[in-house]
Amino acid sequence: MKRIAVFVSGNGSNFENITRFLHGNYNAHVALLVSNRPDAYALQRASRLGVESVVWTKTDFADEQRTIQMLTDHNIHFIVLAGFLLMVPTYLIRHFPNRIINIHPSLLPKYGGKGMYGNHVHEAVKENGEKETGITIHYVSEVCDGGETILQVSTPLSPLDSVDDIAEKVHQLEKEYFPKTVLEILTPKK
């Protein structure tokens, strides 16, 4: 069984959706929540779901040996970034080649890169009058939001949609597609 670590900086709704979706699955399960913020609500979600969690700050991530050891101690095979706002260290990408994925709240390459996360993305989408938005699930590479695309799903927008409306449409796509995509990646092909 593949053991997953989910990296989160905030609320953790995608973490919870993935954990619940994989519950009872024989191919993969969420074994660890890693948050860089001690006040992240995701830590409470992990406690409620019975998932072990660890606060691992930017300073902790700067220590390659300790970070790799922490993940090794938990037998982590795969990493999912779900609202994780730190840049993933290069050493981690090299240690987990094609085993780290991210979800981005836009149709990359639009609205990607440094500073483009959460409502920053949705505000830019609204400001530019986009007719659609969506999600991109991709492998993590050394280029911010530049890894190979696994899945893109779009949703139409109306000029009347507010930033909150856009965010809600994107959250619905995340909820529907992110857990299924994680399982699909980790399910052995026949």
Question: What is each residue range found by the language model?
Answer:
Residues M1-K190:
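One-carbon transfer enzymes
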